[in-house]
From Swiss-Prot:
One GO cellular component term: cytoplasmic vesicle
Topology relative to the membrane: Lipid-anchor
Post-translational modification: The C-terminal 2 residues are removed by ATG4 to expose Gly-117 at the C-terminus. The C-terminal Gly is then amidated with phosphatidylethanolamine by an activating system similar to that for ubiquitin.
Protein's UniProt name: Autophagy-related protein 8A
């Protein structure tokens, strides 16, 4: 299971207020929290909070994550939403609408292995 350190560091009310402010100010963007899954050998990401264009695909966002963690091309990376691999062609806006947390953020975890087994 992924660490939820962002949730532990920030109370629900503060996260809700922040996501509401972000969505109001940047209506064409999605507030995303990206955290490394437990027990994976890929590097830790330098920044957890992202403001992603709504029309970005999951595949394009995975590319952003790869760049941020400086992962070499031959290494695999998997990005999960609620322990499921979202389709790479899906728009981030669609994934957000289906999977956003009660605090208004979309939580994604990444791993070097397909740890949850289902595509």
């Amino acid at each position: 299971m992924a660490r939820t350190s962002f949730k532990l560091e920030h109370p629900l009310e503060r996260r809700q207020a922040e996501s509401a402010r972000i969505r109001e100010k940047y209506s064409d963007r999605i507030p995303v929290i990206v955290e490394k899954a437990d027990k994976t050998d890929v590097p830790e990401i330098d920044k957890k909070k992202y403001l992603v264009p709504a029309d970005l695909t999951v595949g394009q966002f995975v590319y952003v994550v790869r760049k941020r963690i400086k992962l070499s091309p031959e290494k695999a990376i998997f990005v999960f939403v609620k322990n499921t691999l979202p389709p790479t062609a899906s728009l981030m806006s669609a994934i957000y609408e289906e999977n956003k947390d009660e605090d208004g953020f979309l939580y994604m975890t990444y791993s070097g292995e397909n740890t949850f087994g289902s595509a």
